[in-house]
């Protein structure tokens, strides 16, 4: 009996270990400005490993989030999906996306419920992932529950990134910077 319990415990622990993400295959592209950018569907691993996003790791590791932030968000994460539209060329994205991803890591947000799209300077992707979503500024973080948009963060915080994201996830009243 002890052997079965021990084996079950080991299987459970091993299956709960998060496997590191692999970058989504993507080729750097030349933007209309001549700058080399990422374009299309990407993930955090792309940002961590690409030669053109060296800013990401530096920003991610310099950010310190309040360890208490997000403790009350767990009940609100069920069914939550997030689409991130950003530009690797964009200073606002370079400032907000590492911070946002650090916050998601802190609350152990399921990366399977997160989609990241790197956009051109014209706010487009070759696959038109932005179609119908009214992306005018980057970064734009769109939060969905049951396939319906519940709210969005656009370009810069109204109060602070932590406060804004917390309000959106909890379903509290929140109006982004451009409304």
Language-model segments: what does each one mean?
Residues 116-137, 167-169:
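Thioredoxin-like thiol-disulfide oxidoreductase module
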């Amino acid at each position: 009996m002890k052997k079965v319990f021990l084996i079950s415990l080991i299987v459970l622990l091993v299956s709960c270990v998060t496997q590191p993400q692999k970058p989504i295959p993507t080729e750097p592209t030349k933007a209309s400005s001549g700058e080399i950018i990422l374009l299309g569907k990407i993930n955090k691993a792309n940002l961590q490993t690409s030669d053109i996003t060296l800013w990401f790791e530096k920003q991610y590791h310099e950010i310190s989030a309040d360890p208490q932030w997000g403790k009350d968000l767990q009940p609100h994460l069920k069914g939550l999906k997030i689409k991130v539209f950003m530009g690797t060329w964009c200073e606002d994205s370079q400032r907000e996306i590492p911070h946002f991803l650090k916050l998601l890591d802190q609350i152990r947000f399921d990366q399977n419920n997160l989609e990241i799209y790197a956009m051109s300077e014209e706010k487009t992707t070759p696959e038109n992932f932005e179609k119908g979503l009214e992306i005018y500024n980057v970064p734009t973080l769109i939060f969905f529950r049951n396939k319906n948009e519940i709210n969005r963060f656009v370009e810069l915080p109204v109060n602070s990134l932590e406060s804004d994201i917390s309000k959106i996830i909890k379903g509290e009243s929140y109006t982004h910077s451009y409304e």
